[in-house]
């Protein structure tokens, strides 16, 4: 039986994996299992994390195969019910949830907190780890054949907590032991961090994830932003001002042209940012139920923020680092801004310096393209 370890041992693990090191730079082309084995060595906790990540990978490979069948497997986009997180559940949402939870039954995981379940699903109450997961991000895109994904975070199961309770999952972002996502697109890719940099894997024809890059870096600056413009009239002034200044192009305070992107699948937007930089914004707004945005802290914002920081990017809630937050609920929502470090810092200044909207000159301080 796997023994749960907490306290100083966990803190030491986080300290020793906080930054990328040459020892963890696995060779391109090796499998995920081999890369994790090299990283874990003889450390018992790391081996538990590695086993859990391998199980997650196995579950996502099943999901990839189901997605590849498309309409041949039936109407995967049909809405079956209203999910516990407050959104309609598609058939593929439920299929994906079952696949990853079944895969994790073979791993040292005490419980799983999923977007598709109200309460955590208990697996092995004595196991040392917890998993928080969005089994299928972007499921509104299923019937249009646009990229969707699976997002996950691995946390320690702290001593004295009931794995079946919500309380066990109410941890700080810095407590995360691993985070990542799988994107199902033209090819299936895995972005993963265990605190030793951000690793990029691609799924080969034989069903193995193989390493593409063990040192992913997000460009510090890029003239591309992703936001749902249809919500413009619901946003607070700092977000409107930031977007207005981007859209003003060379004639505005930014003095450069910007492109806008929006896929309605966070993993797709995140994957583009890892490849070529940019910024993603899903702020809170004035709509009922959207004061704190739409994205979930525990199983969406936390893992993507971990990946971003490990790739020299940044992730904030508008003012503070996402990873400095502590969850207060399994399905807690949070405003989420992430991407190129310099651009995220600039967006933060629009919140922190509202009177001048960051670096705006007086000419633009009270001007907007739509007001």
Curated annotation (Swiss-Prot):
Signal peptide: none annotated. PANTHER family: FRUCTOSE-1,6-BISPHOSPHATASE-RELATED, SEDOHEPTULOSE-1,7-BISPHOSPHATASE, CHLOROPLASTIC. The keyword Metal-binding applies. This is Fructose-1,6-bisphosphatase class 1 1. Gene3D superfamilies: 3.40.190.80, Fructose-1,6-Bisphosphatase, subunit A, domain 1. The gene is fbp1. It is found in: Cytoplasm. Its EC number is 3.1.3.11. GO terms for biological process: fructose 1,6-bisphosphate metabolic process; fructose 6-phosphate metabolic process; fructose metabolic process; gluconeogenesis; sucrose biosynthetic process. Mg(2+) 1 binds at residues 115, 134, 136. Transmembrane segments: none annotated. The lineage of its organism: Bacteria, Pseudomonadati, Pseudomonadota, Alphaproteobacteria, Hyphomicrobiales. Substrate binds at residues 137-140, 228, 280-282.
């Amino acid at each position: 039986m796997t023994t749960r370890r907490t306290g100083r041992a966990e803190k030491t693990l986080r300290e020793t994996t906080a930054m990328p090191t040459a020892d963890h730079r696995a060779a391109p082309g090796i499998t995920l299992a081999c890369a994790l084995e090299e990283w874990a060595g003889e450390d018992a906790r790391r081996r538990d994390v590695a086993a859990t990540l391998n199980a997650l990978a196995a579950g996502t490979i099943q999901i990839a195969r189901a997605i590849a069948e498309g309409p041949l497997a039936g109407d995967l986009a049909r809405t079956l019910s209203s999910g516990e997180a407050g959104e309609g559940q598609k058939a593929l949402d439920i299929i994906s949830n079952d696949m990853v939870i079944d895969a994790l039954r073979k791993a040292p995981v005490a419980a799983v907190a999923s977007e598709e379940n109200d309460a955590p699903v208990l697996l092995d109450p004595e196991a040392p780890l917890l998993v928080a997961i969005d089994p299928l991000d972007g499921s509104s895109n299923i019937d249009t054949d646009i990229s969707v994904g699976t997002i996950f975070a691995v946390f320690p199961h702290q001593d004295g907590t009931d794995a079946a309770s919500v309380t066990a999952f109410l941890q700080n972002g810095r407590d995360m032991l691993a985070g990542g996502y799988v994107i199902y697109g033209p090819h299936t890719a895995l972005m993963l961090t265990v605190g030793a940099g951000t690793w990029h894997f691609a799924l080969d024809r034989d069903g193995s994830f193989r390493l593409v890059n063990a040192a992913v870096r997000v460009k510090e600056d890029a003239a591309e932003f992703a936001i749902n413009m249809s919500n413009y009239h619901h946003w607070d002034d700092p977000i409107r001002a930031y977007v207005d200044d981007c859209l003003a192009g060379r004639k505005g305070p930014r003095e450069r042209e910007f492109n806008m992107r929006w896929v309605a699948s966070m993993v797709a937007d995140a994957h583009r940012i890892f490849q070529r930089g940019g910024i993603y914004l899903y702020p809170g707004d004035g709509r009922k139920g959207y004061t704190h945005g739409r994205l979930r802290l525990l199983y969406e914002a936390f893992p993507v923020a971990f990946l971003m920081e490990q790739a020299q990017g940044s992730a904030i809630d508008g003012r503070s680092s996402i990873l400095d937050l502590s969850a207060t609920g399994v399905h807690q929502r949070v405003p989420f801004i992430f991407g190129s470090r310099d651009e995220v810092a600039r967006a933060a200044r629009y919140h922190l310096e509202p009177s001048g909207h960051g670096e705006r000159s007086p000419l633009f301080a009270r001007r907007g393209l739509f007001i």
